[in-house]
Amino acid sequence: MAEEPTILTPDGVENPDHDDLQFPARMEDILPEMLMVIPLYERPMFPKMMGPIIIEDMRLQKFILSQKDKKVPLFFALLLTRQDPDGQVKAPESADDFYDVGVVAKVIQISPLTIGEPLQFIVEIKARFDVVKLIKKEPLFQVEVKYWQEEKIKVTDELKAYSTAIIDSIKELVHLNPIFREGLSLLIERINLHEPGSLADFSAAMTTSSGPEIQKVLATRSVRKRIELALVLIKKELEISKLKVKISSRIEEQLSKQQREFFLKQQLQEIKKELGLTKDDTQTEMEKYENRIKDLHLPEEAQERIDEELEKIRLLGPSSPEFNVSRTYLDWLTMMPWGVYTKDNYSVKKARKILDDDHHGLDDVKDRIIELISVGSIKGELTGTILLLTGPPGVGKTSVGQSIARSLGRKFFRFSLGGMRDEAEIKGHRRTYIGAMPGKVIQAIKSCKSANPLIMLDEIDKIGASFRGDPASALLEVLDPEQNSDFLDHYLDVRFDLSKVLFICTANLLDTIPPALLDRMERIELPGYILAEKIAIARKHLIPRQMKHHGLRPSQIIISNPVLTAIVEGYAREAGVRGLETCIRKILRKTITSHLAGGLEKVRIRKRDLRGLLGRRLFAEEQVYSTPRVGVITGLAYTNMGGTTLYIESLAVPTGDSGFKQTGQLGKVMIESSEIAYSYIRFLLGDDSAAVKFFNKNFIHLHVPAGATPKDGPSAGITMACSLYSMATGKTIVPGVAMTGELTLTGLVMPIGGVKEKMIAARRAHVKQVILPKENEEDFDMLPDYIKEDLSAKFVETFEDVLKICFK
């Protein structure tokens, strides 16, 4: 019985010779009452048993080897250690860590000691004992013992019955589990089967029961009770063995059934092959690919590549790793829509109706698509076009792509370029890599099953570069009409014609798009919507869609135009309508929840309900100052969210010295514009002695409110100059005037961008008169009448023209 106890003994002498130690067999065995303790951590041992003990502790090794020359038997106490509440065993620290009953062991033979290896010796168990006193001599244990006096018992019929039951169970156990055969041989050899106590000990030791269960047998004095406990352990072991046999039989039966089915299937397959009723995998694959390419108009290069791969498959077996690689490559080659085109719609009237039904406004986009269809109707085909839709979020750039595809009668595929940093996403991976795939463009063509789909490249301004390459550079070939007729994907390695594909890209900003890529696209700006457009979109599209989404009839919840106006002005002032749709969705949810018990027959949303449904207003009412103030001028700005009003404030701090500073998170260009305005106004008022004295004696502070918002650009030049002029002269601006324009150092007013967005912001702020650069007059004239309505525009060439309009 192998044990690996941790032995605690006094320090011994140095290791003597490592010869085998054999104690005299005839020396009288005198059992000492004080013994060194060898802890057992797994199972106890029983009298009349022999087994190995392994000692790893160097001090105990020295102690044992030092006793071989004393010519006296060497005895130890073997005590089982208790387990902690988690069922774990640990090195004993006190007497409480041991059980109270153990056995005394006599050392029979010591194996030679190899340096660095544990010491192993054979022991014979002599007798049981009770622990009288356990003494810890740091860090070892000694025990004072009282040996059991084995009582002579009369073998009754009951004990005979127990003995017979144990022997029969052991025989059955050996039959079920041959591993117990050695234990049975030992039992027959060493034990008198007519001694119930010894039979109980050996049978308990044969089992795989836990240490505490076997210790219970060891510590039981009553032979009848002990043999009863041993029988329980044997029976438990027998049941476990039966369960193991049952499980093994079931598994073997399943395996045999699977093997039999496999062999039968293999035989059936071979028979079918001999009769010509089936084909091998290679032949089946070959026929599949040949049927696919039968109706395709393959270019010569693609046909040659397919023939090469088919020949490779003929030579490779299905078990070859290259077989699956070639099969995947052939799948892509043969499933591409070579020469397959969808029929285009040349009906201008039908296309216009689809575009108008799906989107309100967006006239520039609609006109460009109508022009494309008109040219196609004359030419007989629609050539590939690359459009770039730019504008703030939520104005319909992405959704308009599907409408354009429907109006043209083409398949539609969209994928986002946002965050893409790997060139292989566009041009594919080379086939040498594991898991290689074609790029997104080829995947889109295959998915659409058409060589002339509409592919939308969303968020093209958010592409990034990395060590894997620059996707924007890979797009140069895709989006160049002069090159994309021979587009080469790294995976396909065969040229594919993209010249018939209509590419539509979307972006919020143009600054992050490389100039070479931007030059290949035709730009169409989608400005923000004005109030009337937002209400029309909500009435025609957003409300019906959300009503359907929430399972409502149109008459159940009514949102009037004044309520929509209040929502737009107070909660959804962004350029697009995404925020407006979010507000409508929130109103419907809260209304359904609050009226669930009473029913939703006809609920009318009122302005006063908005605070409870949407919370407090996110935007204050935007309008110019009703009473003009010195140094405060209203400007117009263009942001990612559309147009907005921009107030410029100037303040003079009397310090006795001149100076100038700007605040409001201004960018470099805007800071330069303010310095130009400051220098020009000082020059302009150079002949005014009062103004000269004012600038010499005051520190000027120019501020642009909403200080947490970064601002940049040159278009606030004349606005800042007017603010400084107003402060220096003490004059106030004419009420209801807003302006935008770049100012040069010589007083010229230069053109600006975002005219439409700025005019929308002016109308929203109830501005009556706007001042624009003369060169933007044509931009203003091209605006729709509903934007120019109630706006009086004045066009200026110099700053002096501005002063004539603003200051009377």
UniProtKB/Swiss-Prot annotation:
Which keywords, in A-to-Z order, does the entry hold? Answer: ATP-binding, Cytoplasm, Hydrolase, Nucleotide-binding, Protease, Serine protease, Stress response
Residue limits of the Lon N-terminal domain?
35-238
Q: Name one GO molecular function term.
A: ATP hydrolysis activity
List S-S links within the chain: none
By sequence similarity, the record places it as follows: Belongs to the peptidase S16 family.
Chain positions recorded as ATP binding sites: G391, P392, P393, G394, V395, G396, K397, T398
EC number per UniProt: 3.4.21.53
Name what induces it.
By heat shock.
Cellular localisation: Cytoplasm
* Reactions catalysed, as given in the entry: Hydrolysis of proteins in presence of ATP
Q: How does it assemble?
A: Homohexamer. Organized in a ring with a central cavity.
Chain's role: ATP-dependent serine protease that mediates the selective degradation of mutant and abnormal proteins as well as certain short-lived regulatory proteins. Required for cellular homeostasis and for survival from DNA damage and developmental changes induced by stress. Degrades polypeptides processively to yield small peptide fragments that are 5 to 10 amino acids long. Binds to DNA in a double-stranded, site-specific manner.
For this protein, the record's Pfam families field holds: AAA, Lon_C, Lon_lid, LON_substr_bdg
Known InterPro entries for this protein? Answer: AAA+_ATPase, ATPase_AAA_core, Lon_bac, Lon_bac/euk-typ, Lon_lid, Lon_proteolytic, Lon_Prtase, Lon_prtase_N
Q: Which domain of life is it from?
A: Bacteria
Positions of the catalytic residues: S715, K758
Q: Does the keyword Nucleotide-binding apply?
A: yes
Recorded protein name is: Lon protease 1
One GO biological process from the UniProt record?
protein quality control for misfolded or incompletely synthesized proteins
